[in-house]
From Swiss-Prot:
Species, as recorded: Yersinia pestis
PANTHER family named in the record: PEPTIDYL-TRNA HYDROLASE (PTHR17224:SF1)
Gene3D superfamilies per record: Peptidyl-tRNA hydrolase
Site (Discriminates between blocked and unblocked aminoacyl-tRNA): 12
EC number: 3.1.1.29
Single GO molecular function: peptidyl-tRNA hydrolase activity
Active site residues per record: 22 (proton acceptor)
Subunit record text: Monomer.
Binding site residues for tRNA: 17, 68, 70, 116
Site entry (Stabilizes the basic form of H active site to accept a proton), positions: 95
Name by which UniProt lists this protein: Peptidyl-tRNA hydrolase
Function recorded in the entry: Hydrolyzes ribosome-free peptidyl-tRNAs (with 1 or more amino acids incorporated), which drop off the ribosome during protein synthesis, or as a result of ribosome stalling. Catalyzes the release of premature peptidyl moieties from peptidyl-tRNA molecules trapped in stalled 50S ribosomal subunits, and thus maintains levels of free tRNAs and 50S ribosomes.
Amino acid sequence: MSSIKLIVGLANPGAEYAQTRHNAGAWYVDLLAERHNQSLKEESKFFGYTARLNLAGQDIRLLVPATFMNLSGKAVAAMASFYRILPEEILVAHDELDILPGMAKLKLGGGNGGHNGLKDIQNKLGNNPNFYRLRIGIGHPGDKSKVTGFVLGKPPASEQTLIDDAIDESIRCTEVLLNEGMTKAMNRLHAFKASA
């Protein structure tokens, strides 16, 4: 079993970004809170929106930073330091260009794949990359020069449905991760592919 104490959903703040692909991590955390009859509330000392859940018998904090994506580490480090949470007790949910919509994958540690949110979190955690990541597939525009516009764009309804289905399965697999550990959660989540 994995002892995750903090689950973070990455996003850009403000209504104009709420429905953009880059905010997929926050969609997951918001839905996770909602499923447990909680809602995130602004907590300025953590530079973000927070909630507290009992998940699989474990006390877990949720966080969606209110900073821009490339400054996400400020909120994560503030909360981790206050509650004495180690990098390996953190799960960060984020949008992933290298995975198709309708799929999501879990991993521990590794690179940041050019994701500015992950980059800043690793930086602010003392350059420690050993935190869990939930990589929510958004697909790739096919051309590197189009990436910024793509992640800051809204997915069409057909893709949104696929992303939502993958987030739904990710929430079920979060309980598996907490109860039965990383291998079981990965095996289940990585076998999932939403169909249109």
